[in-house]
A protein has these predicted regions:
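Polybasic, glycine- and aromatic-enriched phosphate-binding surface used to engage nucleic acids
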Residues: 1-64, 242-247, 251-252, 270, ...
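Short, hydrophobic/amphipathic alpha-helical patches that form generic packing surfaces
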Residues: 6-14, 158-167, 208-212, 290-291, ...
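Signature of N6-adenine DNA methyltransferases within the class I
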Residues: 9-11, 18-69, 73, 80-100, ...
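Class I S-adenosyl-L-methionine
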Residues: 76-172, 181, 251-411, 429, ...
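Class I S-adenosyl-L-methionine-dependent methyltransferase module
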Residues: 78, 173, 365-368, 372, ...
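Flexible, glycine/threonine-enriched loop-and-boundary segments that flank and lead into catalytic domains
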Residues: 137-148, 270-271, 350-370, 413, ...
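Non-catalytic DNA-recognition/assembly elements of restriction-modification systems
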Residues: 147, 376, 519, 560, ...
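Conserved hydrophobic/aromatic pocket- or pore-lining residues that grip, position, or stack substrates
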Residues: 288, 312, 377, 433, ...
């Protein structure tokens, strides 16, 4: 492959392998550097994209893609096809989306048939709507529970797609006397095609196949006319589906299912980062899970692209190995050698000598590693680590010239048993994760072997709730030591047990739980009366989520994990409090990081640090907002106390997920000397290019911050030349917090549609405005409303105007807002009172009835911003592309929550005009871009905590103040006459004065204005 790509950026190559042949497109690219805006000579590693053709392979996708290339060339005879055209023709991501779209449509057809309901997307939310009456089977089989029906359909489809991979190996319906790879690769479709009564295909054909054939240990016997594999492990266990034996499902949906699946190639191999087969692979199961759950994004779950999974797994494994013998692995030769072993790159002579000398030690470390994903989802991260550990072991064994004592499948099985653990609160996630591990073993088997039982490897539980917060109670209980050893033995034996042995071991486990309870009950009453009652709740053999998680009781891991890795849920506490107030209360009680309006991922970091070993590593992909947001204070303090901030790779505005979530890869390791910070420095079109960026990172390309300098205060993280400029600015002694007494958010009414009136027209002492709540115009007294600004009304230097008002049930006395009494409104403002009464029930019902208070039901939800609005101030929208500050000289305007007001401290000599110029300057915008929080489209949030840290010189020369003020006055004058007036010259002069104030040099100014 290297030889092919030495001279060209792209090549089409055919590789022939017997009756199969691979048609590959191999490409490499040069990289555009975002900072310098130039194309760098550094090329990416070559990548191969392959269609598999030949006997038993599908060609529809390839034919459609190649035809598109032909048509494009026909339409543009004088334009050559570009690399982008070829990459589109060989796009794996495109195939994944196509397949998932078809799969989801089939899923929805089945669900709609049973429930009469279908999920549709309204805005960013999935909403269930009734299409038609529910089928009688919803009542008869599913107890009128739509979720039961949805879960059944997911399991059924999951089993079918799993069997598509199995039949690809030739393991279904193997004729008597034939080898295991000579089964029918079209078995499922032919089973349906030949079915006499297709309406009963599920009950008459799939039920026997799933639960009587594939779950039968005798089905593999040679004397059977047709042999099938015995797929134990729980995938075809009937426990959850015993009620549905007679279920009838429409034949036309099955027909659509099989015709769709038959259009795609299924491959049993999961690709390496630089190898891509354009086919449906086992990883697709993860994609299906992460996207199929209609409320998954509401749960904060997002599917992680495999390029990121590969990188995180390799880096975590490297970090783990380096920590095993810090003296041995301290020098650069050791680090480089380990990196190349994990990357499977060619070693030079010195590296090879190191690897050969230390092979046993490295293999031993690889066999002992303990890995946990605390929110396992589809199992992508543990699956990735399984593959990396396997690859590294094989690499070292081949280097030493060892003969393999075990098959690939046996090696993987051993890794799963000794190293892999996962937890998820969602039973569906646990099912899919287990399924992926089974598939990873099936891939490498030449003949079917019993699958391991993963009940004690991947559990359904709430990771965030510990069994007990008193660590001393859990392991030292008089008389319980022998029982605990017995439990460990059951756990070990269960992994490889047969169907009959499983039942016996399950009984043993439950008996031992009860025995433990009886042994410890007297001790328990005096220590923790609930502890062992909670223990009995854990039943790994059911798909019911346990309300707590403990690595020792569930996995036998007492001293912590070496690697905790994953993609934790992103959920704000407000959403959790609405859906599960009990959990919200528990989190705030248990975790220091659960402060303010926290997001769930910060709690996952704290929990991960509790369950990782002292020298272990936590590696998550998650938002970086915690570094500079108020809610991150608790987590920042924890990391500061432990010196645990190790590495952050921030992706900026590049959206790794199909959501407005801005993330980074983040490593946490106790007792780290410094935090390495990297920031995406190039424009990316795809996750492939993201992979190239990650591979290009070197220690010298980051910025390093001593952990001793990181506190609970906001972290200002910048990279490259940017870091030097920010460091220089930060030498200034004052901050915006020293200048402004109040930076306040606008009105929080908790029912804007009632309080805000639109398109207002003066009518003497009254105003006529449109009420969205009543969907009509209403008349109201002028004295009962205030002018209202929304974010869209505020632009840089503009003369502020608005045709909106806010209904304002407060009177201002001595600068304080006091709520009118109901009788006062009734007598003084009868029009306003009539309007409020018309909306009374809505206002009383706000926030679950919190305002159902006589004489106060019309008050705002919060009093923020009420007392300060009628003062001279600056105003700015919360979200903005560049500075958009304006001047409310007379303090006329109130605003929504999306506009902030700025009021100076007494004694600050610089006028509002000067600060208006500074806030609208390029330097201030640059500071926000480098230290703030990016949103879609390059917009940034101008919330208080991002503004306050801006550095301010101790003394600002009078001539600078005067010059900026005069220039701002000129701009405001021009804007009064026409908002379209050109003000570029004045703005440039203001920028130059600000640069001079901060002593910025030509190269620094060029960096800021780039």
């Amino acid at each position: 492959m290297k030889d092919i790509t030495k001279q060209v950026a792209g090549a089409m190559v055919v590789f022939v392998q017997g009756d199969k042949w691979r048609f590959s497109y191999i490409s490499k690219r040069k990289v555009k550097n975002k900072e310098t805006n130039t194309i760098e000579d550094k090329e990416t590693a070559p990548k191969r994209y392959t269609y598999l053709f030949g006997k038993g392979e599908k060609a529809l996708t390839a034919a459609q893609r190649f035809d598109k290339l032909i048509q494009k060339q026909k339409d543009n005879l004088f334009d050559l096809l570009s690399l982008d055209d070829f990459e589109d023709a060989f796009s794996v991501e495109k195939l994944s989306k196509e397949f998932f779209k078809s799969y989801k449509e089939i899923y929805e057809h089945f669900v709609e048939f049973i429930t009469g309901k279908r999920y549709v997307k309204k805005g960013s939310k999935w909403t269930e709507i009734q299409i038609h009456e529910a089928h009688f089977q919803l009542r008869n089989y599913f107890d009128n529970d739509s979720k039961q029906a949805r879960d059944f359909v997911k399991r059924m489809l999951g089993r079918i797609v799993f069997l598509y991979f199995i039949q690809k190996k030739g393991w279904l319906a193997v004729p008597k006397g034939k080898k295991w790879d000579e089964g029918n690769p079209e078995y499922l479709f032919e089973l349906f095609k030949n079915a006499k009564y297709k309406e009963s295909f599920y009950s008459d054909y799939l039920v026997p196949l799933f639960f009587e054939t594939l779950n039968n240990p005798n089905v593999q016997k040679e004397n059977n006319e047709l042999r099938f594999p015995y797929l134990n492990g729980g995938l075809f266990d009937k426990t959850q589906d015993y009620k549905y034996d007679k279920l009838a499902l429409p034949s036309e949906i099955f027909e659509k299912l099989f015709s769709t699946f038959n259009n795609y190639n299924f491959t049993i191999y999961e690709d390496a980062p630089d190898e891509h087969t354009i086919a449906v692979d086992p990883e697709m199961l993860g994609h299906i899970f992460e996207n199929l759950l209609e409320d998954n994004k509401d749960k904060g779950a997002f599917y992680t692209p495999k390029e990121i999974v590969h990188y995180m797994c390799k880096e975590s494994l490297k970090t783990y190995l380096l920590a095993q013998d810090e003296k041995l692995f301290a020098d650069e030769l050791a680090k480089t050698s380990l990196e190349k072993i994990i990357q499977q790159q060619e070693l030079n002579e010195d590296e090879k000598a190191f690897a050969e000398k230390n092979a046993y030690r490295i293999i031993d470390a690889l066999e002992k590693v303990k890995i946990c994903d605390p929110a396992i989802g589809s199992g992508a991260f543990p699956m990735g680590l399984l593959q990396e550990i396997f690859n590294a072991q094989i690499y070292l064994q081949e280097l030493k010239g060892f003969k393999k004592a075990k098959s690939d499948a046996d090696i993987k099985k051993h890794i799963i048993e000794e190293s892999i653990y996962g937890v998820d609160v969602d039973a569906g996630a646990v099912d899919i994760a287990r399924l992926r591990f089974w598939l990873s073993l099936v891939v490498d088997e030449e003949v079917p072997q019993p699958l391991p039982n993963l009940a004690f490897k991947i559990v359904c539980a709430n990771t965030l709730i510990p069994l007990s917060t008193d660590k001393s109670n859990q392991y030292q209980i008089a008389g319980a030591t022998d029982i605990i050893k017995e439990i460990e033995k059951v756990r070990h034996n269960y992994f490889d047990s047969s169907k009959e042995e499983k039942k016996d071991l399950e009984r043993q486990f439950k008996n031992l739980q009860n025995k433990l309870w009886n042994t410890a009950k007297d001790w328990v009453i005096s220590k923790d009366a609930d502890l062992y009652q909670r223990l009995l709740e854990f039943n790994p053999f059911e798909d019911k989520s346990c309300s707590w998680f403990d690595p020792w009781w569930m996995f036998g891991v007492k001293d912590g994990f070496d690697i905790v890795i994953g993609n934790p849920p992103y959920l704000r506490i407000q959403g959790i409090r609405d859906s599960n107030p009990k959990l919200a209360d528990a989190l705030t009680k248990i975790y220091k990081s659960a402060s303010g309006s926290f997001d769930l991922y910060v709690v996952f970091v704290e929990r991960a640090l509790q369950i990782v070993k002292a020298n272990g590593v936590v590696n998550f992909i998650m938002p970086t907002k915690w570094t500079n947001a108020a809610f991150g204070k608790g987590l920042r303090q924890i990391l500061s106390d432990k010196n645990a901030a190790n590495k952050i790779i921030y992706f900026g505005a590049y959206q790794v997920f199909d959501a407005s979530t801005y993330t980074g890869i983040q490593f946490f390791k106790a007792n780290s000397d410094e935090l390495s910070y990297y920031e995406l420095d190039r424009d990316l079109k795809s996750n492939d290019e993201l992979s190239d960026y990650l591979q290009s990172l070197t220690p010298i390309s980051g910025t390093f911050i001593a952990n001793s300098k990181l506190t609970s205060d906001i972290w200002t993280l910048t990279a490259g030349g940017t870091s030097k400029i920010i460091d220089k600015l930060n030498l200034q002694p004052r901050r915006i917090s020293d200048i402004f007494e109040k930076i306040f958010q606008g009105l929080a009414t908790s029912k804007d549609d009632v309080y805000f009136l639109y398109d207002c027209v003066d009518e003497g002492d009254d105003i006529i405005g449109f009420s969205k709540q009543l969907n009509k115009s209403i008349k109201i007294e002028r004295g009962f409303v205030k002018p209202l600004l929304k974010g869209e009304d505020v632009h840089r230097y503009d003369n502020i105007t608005s045709n909106r008002v806010v209904v304002f049930p407060y009177k201002l006395e001595n600068g304080n807002a006091e709520l009118y009494k109901e009788d006062e409104i009734k007598n003084q403002f009868p029009l306003a009172y009539a309007y409020l009464k018309e909306c009374e029930s809505i206002l009383r019902d706000r926030e679950k009835g919190r305002f159902n208070i006589d004489d106060e039901w019309f008050q705002f939800g919060r009093k923020q911003g009420i007392n300060f609005a009628e003062k001279e101030k600056l105003v700015a929208p919360e979200i903005s592309l560049g500075g958009n500050f304006a001047y409310d000289k007379n303090g006329r305007f109130y605003s929504t929550t999306k506009v902030y007001g700025y009021i100076k401290k007494d004694g600050v000599k610089e006028s509002y005009l000067f600060w208006l110029g500074l806030f609208n300057s390029k330097l201030f915008w640059y500071f926000i871009q480098q230290t703030g929080y990016v949103l879609r489209g390059g917009y940034f949030t101008f919330k208080t905590n991002y503004i306050l840290p801006f550095p301010v010189p101790k003394i600002i020369p009078t001539e600078t103040i005067s010059a900026v003020e005069e220039l701002v006055k000129k701009i405001l004058k021009k804007k009064e006459n026409s908002y379209r007036k050109n003000i570029l010259n004045e703005e440039k002069e203001i920028d130059n004065f600000i640069y001079k104030l901060y002593d910025l040099k030509t190269d620094e100014i060029s960096e800021i204005e780039r």
